[in-house]
Amino acid sequence: MNIKNFLNNRLWKNNSSLVQLLGLCPVLAMTTNAINAIGLGMTTTLVLTITNTIISSFRKIIPKDLRIPIYMMIISSVVTSIEMLLHAYTFNLYQSLGIFIPLIVTNCIIVGRADLIAYKSSIVESFFDGIFIGLGSMFAMFAVGSIREILGNGTLFFGANKIISNIHSSVFFTLLDKKFTIILAVFPPGGFLILGFLIAIKNFIDLYYKKNTIKNIEQCSCSNKIK
């Protein structure tokens, strides 16, 4: 397994949020600030990793015709367990994420990776696939959430105590004066526009890199012909 290609495919080239556009409902609804984005991203990554590992472990005994209902049972069990842990140990984050924790069960990313990778691959590959697909989605959520929080509220990492309980609620960065904030950014249309902007930036970077690669190949070919 080529590690570089493995990471590039999951974190950048086939990013589940910026390329495949899966699970957009929680991405747009819960990324009103950076902390919510991190919380939801970490939860989704944990669910992906655990479910991928479990499904891969039992892939040889899961009947092909019944695999989807079995996926859903495993995913819902894992999500319920994690929801109970969040309720017990990070109650503020649990309250903030609300209904979007149980809705992780229906997230297309998790079901898709279970069927595409976990059901057909080794436990180790499935485990790392879950981690890096989740991290790729979390990075996209964090980027959207950070931009929305800065533009909409002028702050960054407001409410960090939701994730790290021993941090005081007043610990955050103020980057923009309230009179310069754009309230649209914290609403779903603003999130949609910011997500589209990030997708456009990614596509521009990919296109620029592709053109440079082609240009370098052509220059090398010309140099070889001259020689």
UniProtKB/Swiss-Prot annotation:
GO terms for cellular component: plasma membrane. It comes from the Bacteria. GO terms for biological process: electron transport chain. InterPro entries: NqrDE/RnfAE, RnfE. The chain crosses the membrane at residues 34-56, 68-88, 91-111, 127-147, 181-201. It is an enzyme of class 7 (translocase). This is Ion-translocating oxidoreductase complex subunit E.
